Regions:
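Charged interaction segments
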Residues: 222-225, 237, 246-247, 252
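Short acidic/glycine-rich loop or secondary-structure boundary segments that cap or lie
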Residues: 212-214, 242-245
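A conserved mid-domain beta-alpha-beta active-site/ligand-binding segment of alpha/beta enzyme cores
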Residues: 243-322
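Positively charged, amphipathic N-terminal segments that serve as targeting/anchoring signals
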Residues: 47-229
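Short beta-alpha junction loops
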Residues: 152-156, 236-243
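N-terminal chloroplast transit peptides
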Residues: 1-64
């Protein structure tokens, strides 16, 4: 199995928290269908990320590790250390139940943040940092070379190799590559048959949500390299709610909309956090194998106001469950 006994306070996680700015050659990034450079991120942003990660590490050093398996009464995480530990145990439980296609989704701009609270480029950078920490604690070092981490595009792989994944043994790969029209938001899909190797056992796909082609390639990866094999696939912060909610009109994006009937029914959401703001705000939370819970914060504590076995739609939570609780 992939389970690792690594602790979050291991030395391998510390360098990733205090990284220097990358050179412009490795800083190409996608936002609003044009390239901007990660090197334009201010040093204060990286200091913020480093400070947050180091606070997580210091908090973890004061806690005793627990061998208790994930149960039905998992509390909302206190910080990102708790979150990653819960996600690790949830994924382990799903693997024991022979789940093959899994989703992990949570906000990166703060545990109680909502999409849009953070700048897109910064949120992706933080996802990359958290994915590395998840890999370090979840994947056995002996399995690292059999684990392939897919980023949205080749430039992201270059950035990862020089920052969060520097020195890592994981195989880093990409879903799309630039095309002649990349400045207009067009990319070429990568043939998964050309990327996957026979020794690969686990695929982890990082935030495949900016370009619509990215999730279509993920579907291809599942069909060609995971289905009917012993391999596993984890989609990490893919913002799949955009597809579930109809954000992409089926008339214009029929292949993407079809994923809700073809790929998503095969997928187990093993760890999930989605926040709702406002007077009737709350949280939709799930930690496998537990039920889906709707939580509300009361006097700085999260209280469960509703739970069910199947995932409710975000619209149902926002318009029905939270207002009536």
């Amino acid at each position: 199995m992939y389970f690792s006994n690594a602790n979050f306070v291991s030395s391998s996680t510390i360098p990733a928290a205090v990284l220097p700015l990358p050179s412009r050659n490795y800083a190409c990034f996608r936002m609003s269908h044009r390239k901007i450079h990660r090197s334009l991120l201010s040093s204060s942003v990286l200091e913020f990320m480093a400070g947050r990660n180091l606070r997580v590490l210091s908090n973890s050093s004061n806690r005793e590790s627990s061998d208790t398996s994930t149960d039905f009464d998992v509390p909302f995480p206190r910080d990102y250390f708790d979150l990653l530990d819960q996600a690790k145990k949830a994924t382990e439980a799903a693997l024991r139940d022979n789940k093959q296609l899994m989703e992990i989704e949570f906000p990166t701009a703060g545990l109680e943040s909502v999409p849009g609270d953070g700048e897109g480029g910064i949120e992706m950078t933080e996802s990359m940092q958290l994915i590395r920490q998840f890999c370090d604690c979840f994947i056995d070092p002996l399995k690292a070379t059999r684990t392939r981490v897919f980023f949205p595009e080749a430039n992201e792989v270059k950035f990862a190799r020089n920052t969060a994944f520097e020195g890592a043994s994981f195989k880093l790969d990409y879903l799309t590559k630039p095309s002649f029209f990349e400045d207009f938001g067009f990319v070429e899909k990568v043939k998964m048959a050309d990327r996957v190797k026979p020794e690969d056992e686990l695929f982890l796909v990082a935030y495949p949500y900016f370009n619509v082609n990215e999730m279509l390639v993920v579907e291809e990866l599942y069909k060609e390299a995971v289905a009917n094999t012993a391999r596993k696939l984890i989609i990490f912060n893919g913002e799949l709610d955009r597809i579930r909610s109809g954000y992409y009109p089926p008339f214009f994006y029929p292949k993407l909309a079809a994923l809700t009937k073809t790929l998503f029914p095969k997928m187990e959401t093993v760890y999930y956090i989605h926040n709702f703001k406002g007077q009737k705000g709350g949280v939709l939370f799930r930690c496998y194998p537990g039920p889906w819970k709707v939580l509300r914060k009361v006097r700085n504590k999260f209280v469960c106001v509703h739970q069910q076995q199947d995932m409710p739609s975000l619209k149902e939570v926002a318009l029905n469950i939270l207002p009536s609780s």
